[in-house]
Amino acid sequence: MSNHAEASVAPVEAYEPPYYVAVFTAVRTQDQSGYSETNARMEVLVKDVPGFLGMDHAQSPGGLSITVGYFRDADALTEWRCNAEHRAAQKRGQEEWYQSYTLHVAKVERSHGFTRAQAAQSPTAG
């Protein structure tokens, strides 16, 4: 049995609402030339946007990728959407890297999280 506690994978924290999320779901094409480099650049660039809170990313074995960006307010989200390098990456994505994608933007009104304690959990004899 694998021990998931050893992995460095964790969701972003539950931020204080309200805040905004941009949920990007995509299926990529076979040709991914330049994708990794551009994606890495976007991950660095978005961190410079005032109001950027964090990002989660997951990919299914079937090829669906999901990226969730968290932003403090609509202005931060707009700044990212209008960034010239980001716009160029979006254009290239439509031309080369994505078979299909969907973007959902929402205002988060409620948020909470859970983290299991690091101490071993064992049932109490009873």
Q: Can you say where each PLM-predicted feature lies in the sequence?
A:
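Conserved RNP beta-strands of RNA recognition motif
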Residues: 67-73
